[in-house]
């Protein structure tokens, strides 16, 4: 259904603020989970159980001095973190949070998501170049090479989903996963290879361990944001955690039924009055949120348990393994659609 403009504006306002809050919650969750993995307590001083620690960190960053290197390009140096945050905040507009609840329900939604996530590499590259530092520049170059390499494999995974759904519209892709008994229509069951490739490449696209070569501390000090301080530095971290949550949203939407409630057809058969109700919309939103939180936890767990790839291993995995397997998977899915649809 088409929402009135004022409802769309209200949802957009709520989502932007929710993503800002989510970044803080994810920082807290990461610290607590890493503390658990390493047998530590994690933050436990500011607020109940340390929950307000991320907000204290934001206040600290706001009052820190904003230092710009003497030979840096001041305009681009300030523009780079802005690009990162803006792109990260834009992608959720294309994700349906419940049936009919989406800010921008466009026919080429999947392509728009891929395009927006691709643009974020400009922020990292510009940050590396504008800082006039060899460490920052190397981090920017690494990021460009990494994201270009893994976007191809990610594209093959998305293409296989498009072939299955027969549409580029994100809502249509979610609804296509209603086919099949209970949860067996989800693309993770009908296209497991594509799901695995997309999850792996999503780790690389968000520059998280084991794919965090652009900001490898042991090699590049801080990578592309070595010369950033104050709130500009904080904006990079805000973008990183928003991207983490957005990537989890996209994984859940394309391969795990999105807002579809598990066993939804059986639920509607037992309670027909739920069809089109606000309660069903709330259940769908909570279903999407639960799936997203699971993948956000997976991101954090992998970061604190897996070692970093070497650069040659990173490139080999992308070009020699994921891309050929992804292309073969597209061919198999295309044959399956042609023969059995």
From Swiss-Prot:
* UniProt keywords, alphabetically: Cell inner membrane, Cell membrane, Membrane, NAD, Quinone, Translocase, Transmembrane, Transmembrane helix
**According to its record, how does it sit in the membrane?**
Multi-pass membrane protein
Q: Does the keyword Glycosyltransferase apply?
A: no
Q: Which GO terms describe its cellular component?
A: plasma membrane
Known EC number(s)? 7.1.1.-
Q: Which NCBIfam families match?
A: PRK06076.1-2
Primary role: NDH-1 shuttles electrons from NADH, via FMN and iron-sulfur (Fe-S) centers, to quinones in the respiratory chain. The immediate electron acceptor for the enzyme in this species is believed to be menaquinone. Couples the redox reaction to proton translocation (for every two electrons transferred, four hydrogen ions are translocated across the cytoplasmic membrane), and thus conserves the redox energy in a proton gradient.
Similarity remark: Belongs to the complex I subunit 1 family.
> What interactions and quaternary structure are annotated?
NDH-1 is composed of 14 different subunits. Subunits Nqo7-14 constitute the membrane sector of the complex.
| Name under which the protein is recorded | NADH-quinone oxidoreductase subunit 8
**Organism of provenance:** Rhodothermus marinus
Taxonomy of origin reads: Bacteria, Pseudomonadati, Rhodothermota, Rhodothermia, Rhodothermales
